[in-house]
Amino acid sequence: MRRGLLIILSSPSGAGKSTLARRLRDWDTDIEFSVSATTRAARPGEVDGREYHFVDEAAFKSQVSNGGMLEHAHVFGNFYGSPSGPVQEAINAGRDVLFDIDWQGAQQITNSALSAHTLSIFLLPPSIRELRNRLEKRAQDDAATIARRMDKSWDEISHWGSYDYVLVNDDLDTTEAHLKTIVTATRLRRSQQPGLTEHVRHLQSEFERLS
C-alpha cells in the first residue's frame, strides 16, 4: 500500500483553484478534501463540516495552541486552518488529501513533519487583466472585496517559486490534464511506496537462491 499524498493547490483568487480542485476530486473520488476550520460566518448554502468547520475565534486559537492545526493563516479578517488529526489519519491509511490554501498555509505544511509526502502546485493566471475579469464575472464579491483580492493577488503570486509545480491556467481543460499527470506521477515516487524495500529484499533472496 502506498502512502497518501498531501496535494496543495494555491493561487490568487480567480485563477481557477476551486474549480480545478473540484475536477480533481471528480476524477478520483478517493481524494479527500481537507475541510478547513474558519472563524468567518457561513455563506448561504454552506453546511458546517462540509465546506468548512465554522468555529469562533476562541475555539480556533485554542486548537492552534494545542497543536491541533497543521497550518493556519489570517486572511481578509478571518482565521483559516487545517485540523491535523484527520489529515494524519488519511495519510497513514494511504488516502490523498487535497488542500485549497494560500501560500502561508502551503509553507507551513511543506515545513512540517509531513513534508516528504507533500505535492505543491501553484496556479498562475494568463494575465492580471484576465484575473480581474474572472473575479468580476463570478459576481460573488462586491467592488471593495474584489479590490482587496486584487491587492493581495501579487503577494500570492510572488511566492510561486516555492512550489513543486507551477501551471499557467489559460485553458481549464489543459490545466486539468496537466494536474492529473502530476498527481499520477507523484503517487509513484519512491517515498510514497513503503513496500518497495521489502519487495527488493524478496528479489534479493530469490536471486541468491537461483544463483
UniProtKB/Swiss-Prot annotation:
Catalytic activity: GMP + ATP = GDP + ADP
Binding residues for ATP: 11-18
EC class name: transferase
Pfam families: Guanylate_kin
Localization per record: Cytoplasm
Similarity annotation: Belongs to the guanylate kinase family.
Family matches, as HAMAP family: Guanylate_kinase
Protein's name in the database: Guanylate kinase
Organism: Roseobacter denitrificans (strain ATCC 33942 / OCh 114)
Classification of source organism: Bacteria, Pseudomonadati, Pseudomonadota, Alphaproteobacteria, Rhodobacterales
Annotated gene: gmk
